[in-house]
UniProtKB/Swiss-Prot annotation:
GO terms for biological process: humoral immune response; positive regulation of alpha-beta T cell proliferation; positive regulation of type II interferon production; T cell proliferation; T-helper 1 type immune response. This is Interleukin-27 subunit beta. Heterodimer with IL27/IL27A; not disulfide-linked. This heterodimer is known as interleukin IL-27. Heterodimer with IL12A; not disulfide-linked. This heterodimer is known as interleukin IL-35. Interacts with SQSTM1. The keyword Repeat applies. Residues 24-130, 131-227 form the Fibronectin type-III domain. PROSITE patterns: FN3, HEMATOPO_REC_L_F3.
Length: 229
């Protein structure tokens, strides 16, 4: 093979459009990861999205692992995924009140390379319960409205790891909600509500000891106060 022919072959192979192959995008995108302990203390659930890379339609798989502590050479364990292409995983071996953070590593594996995101967290700091369930309203005498609800079904031990609650409510046509709480029971009586008015009520939950953040608000429950009630 002459030197000229060899040079031509090298140039052709290094030019993806010339050889019919697709080259890698200009830059690999990083997974955007978030973790939440809505099932405290039995699990931490993490999920992620991957911004699309320019000019790429190739399938991407993910490898999710975690370690306890910031040491780069610490032992790692798999964060459980349903399939390699799943965009979520679960940590089931949760150490409570650990001073060392967990570090989740999510690696996106592309045909042309990989990109990784590292997310440190303390389990108690990412507690966010799911919304309370079964919110129901019962008009009572003397302009009172009873609100009852259940802890979120995903919260495994409400009798041990207690929750506190907030209520927000407004009557139909009002511009803003009134807010009541914290409440350490699963019922509450709203007083001085207006006769014939229709009320919208929602409930949110938080860890009793103030770890983490408030849940999202529950689905609204509605009730109309009768005349004389």
């Amino acid at each position: 093979m002459t030197p000229q022919l060899l040079l031509a072959l090298v140039l052709w192979a290094s030019c993806p459009p010339c050889s019919g192959r697709k080259g890698p995008p200009a830059a690999l995108t990083l997974p955007r990861v978030q973790c939440r302990a809505s099932r405290y203390p039995i699990a931490v659930d993490c999920s992620w999205t991957l911004p699309p890379a320019p000019n790429s339609t190739s399938p991407v798989s993910f490898i999710a692992t975690y370690r306890l502590g910031m040491a780069a050479r610490g032992h790692s364990w798999p964060c459980l995924q349903q399939t390699p292409t799943s965009t979520s995983c679960t940590i089931t071996d949760v150490q409570l009140f650990s001073m060392a953070p967990y570090v989740l590593n999510v690696t996106a594996v592309h045909p042309w390379g990989s990109s990784s995101s590292f997310v440190p967290f303390i389990t108690e700091h990412i507690i966010k319960p799911d919304p309370p369930e079964g919110v129901r309203l019962s008009p009572l005498a003397e302009r009172q409205l009873q609100v009852q609800w259940e802890p979120p079904g995903s919260w495994p031990f409400p009798e041990i790891f207690s929750l506190k609650y907030w209520i927000r409510y407004k009557r139909q046509g009002a511009a803003r909600f009134h807010r009541v709480g914290p409440i350490e029971a699963t019922s509450f009586i709203l007083r001085a509500v207006r006769p014939r008015a229709r009320y919208y009520v929602q409930v949110a939950a938080q860890d009793l000891t103030d770890y983490g953040e408030l849940s999202d608000w529950s689905l609204p429950a509605t009730a109309t106060m009768s005349l004389g009630k």
